[in-house]
Amino acid sequence: MASTSQPHVAVVGGDTLLARELREVLEAESPAPRIHLIAATTDNATVLSADDEDVAVMTPLTAESLEGNSVTFLAGSPASSRRTLKLAPSTPLIDLTASLDEQPEARLRAPSAEPANTRRAKATV
């Protein structure tokens, strides 16, 4: 039986269109993860972002805001991606912007080009 605990993920650059699309995909998962939105800046203020559908609260980009997440998605600027790597070098990062692809420790993946037997299979209920 699969665990139903809610995973915790962070999204740096939480106010971008890419982050919004990522949130839609993640919220459709079961169980949906708890999503922690992080602004691409290090300002000490909490940022409120409003669009047509919802209001999002984003915390500043700090080492503390990156703690306790299973994974951090990078959806902001190249500068915010580099700052995230510096602040939390041991945190698993998924760079959706390819800002860190030249880092020596980066693991590049192209799921659509991988053999079918290495892709994650969808669970059926």
Segments and roles (model prediction):
Residues 1-125:
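N-terminal Rossmann-like NAD(P) cofactor-binding subdomain of oxidoreductases
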